[in-house]
């Protein structure tokens, strides 16, 4: 697309949004993704890298513009190919296992209207289960919506990042939400994805052995492959070498801490917690982790558990500032304070916190309230 024409379109004409997808064997997820784009994207460009299932048929039946593409083990190349095929003034890059959140249309319209020459960050919401049986949702910020200019392209074979060569282009938060289902893959599909990613990342790391971000991503992939000791080496190397202002470093810290907790390396946990608090003393996820780790390791320090959870609540939602697990500064902290007071038989305090958690939409708090009520009734009968 001619850049001068794109700038003119972006600024003076009605915005046109092209959604771009890179797909292979996505018949399971693609229908929901395309449905979420209906009435929002003016054009949908799908780059198929060799599907053998019904992906291409689904794409064609939904009126998308479909291109075959020979996969070159390079996600940035594939995404840039999609951008070249887009005719819109703006690009929304979305994966097949993602869906636009229901409230995103107005936010997209506002971004296109008020920030036509900016890079737009969206929140990717990824649900996952923890060992306590509860479902948590990780929230991370990624640039996915941007003007269709030749100065804006992707770099990196894997975990590619959008780069603008124009220093005047700013990045803004949009409030747009993408709901991610990628962790719902079958075991075999997840193993295949992990193997592919690890191969690409290791090739990149050979070229850039001191790239802290690559070490972080290798560590994440090794965790998924259950290679914990090797993952920890990459995490710790990334932590000490990442630049102070690196936006991914808080997420890297939390990934390291949760891995150490799984490995039950308590001494290392508290050393990295101290390191983290020196840098991120307003990060609710960090205090939430400390409280959960103290409880899990049965450390006899009830005042510290209480203080950490209360600090989470006083800090509140910091998802605009940090990559967060939803609720660490709100409903999850309230719920865990409920647990804290319940095990000490302080039932009125427990009830108040469970109720507050439920009022904020955390449905497991309802079962906790019912359980607590049964306990109270049983004690009264005695």
List where the protein language model places each region.
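Cell-envelope/extracellular polymer assembly enzymes that use nucleotide-activated donors
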Residues: 16-18
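Conserved donor nucleotide-binding strand/loop of the catalytic core
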Residues: 42, 56-81, 85
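Short, well-formed alpha-helical segments that are part of the catalytic scaffolds
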Residues: 20-43
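Acidic helix N-cap motif at the loop->helix transition within catalytic regions
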Residues: 28-31, 53-62, 103
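Catalytic-site signature of metal-activated, phosphate-bearing donor transferases
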Residues: 2-5, 77-83, 89, 94, ...
């Amino acid at each position: 697309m001619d850049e001068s024409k794109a700038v003119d379109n972006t600024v003076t004409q009605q915005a046109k949004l092209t959604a771009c997808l890179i797909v292979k064997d996505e018949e399971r997820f693609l229908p929901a993704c395309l449905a979420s784009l209906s009435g929002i994207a003016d054009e949908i460009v799908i780059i198929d890298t060799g599907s053998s299932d019904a992906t291409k048929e689904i794409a064609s039946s939904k009126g998308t513009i479909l291109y075959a593409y020979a996969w070159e083990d390079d996600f940035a190349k594939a995404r840039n190919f999609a951008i070249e095929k887009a005719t819109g003034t703006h690009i929304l890059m979305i994966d097949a296992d993602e869906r636009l959140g229901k409230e995103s249309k107005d936010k997209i319209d506002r971004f296109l209207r008020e920030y036509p020459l900016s890079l737009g960050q969206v929140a990717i919401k990824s649900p996952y289960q923890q060992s306590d049986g509860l479902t948590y949702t990780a929230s991370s910020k990624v640039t996915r919506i941007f003007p269709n200019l030749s100065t804006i392209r992707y770099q990196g074979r894997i975990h590619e990042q959008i780069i603008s060569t124009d220093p005047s282009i700013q990045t803004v938060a949009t409030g747009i939400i993408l709901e991610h289902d990628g962790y719902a893959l079958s075991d075999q599909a997840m193993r295949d994805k992990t193997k592919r990613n690890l191969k690409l990342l290791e090739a990149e790391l050979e070229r850039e052995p001191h790239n802290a971000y690559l070490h972080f991503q290798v560590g994440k992939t090794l965790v998924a492959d259950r290679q914990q000791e090797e993952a920890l080496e990459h995490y710790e190397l990334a932590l000490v070498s990442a630049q102070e202002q690196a936006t991914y470093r808080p997420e890297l810290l939390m990934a390291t801490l949760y891995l150490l907790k799984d490995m039950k390396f308590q001494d290392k946990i508290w050393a990295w917690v101290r390191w983290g608090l020196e840098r991120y003393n307003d990060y609710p996820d960090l205090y939430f982790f400390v409280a959960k780790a103290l409880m899990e390791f049965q450390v006899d320090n009830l005042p510290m558990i209480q203080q950490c959870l209360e600090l989470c609540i006083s800090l509140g939602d910091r998802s605009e500032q940090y990559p967060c697990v939803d609720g660490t500064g709100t409903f999850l902290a309230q719920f865990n304070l409920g647990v804290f007071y319940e095990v000490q038989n302080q039932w009125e305090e427990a009830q108040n916190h469970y109720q507050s958690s439920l009022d904020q939409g955390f449905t497991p708090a309802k079962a906790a309230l019912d359980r607590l009520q049964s306990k109270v009734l049983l004690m009264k009968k005695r």
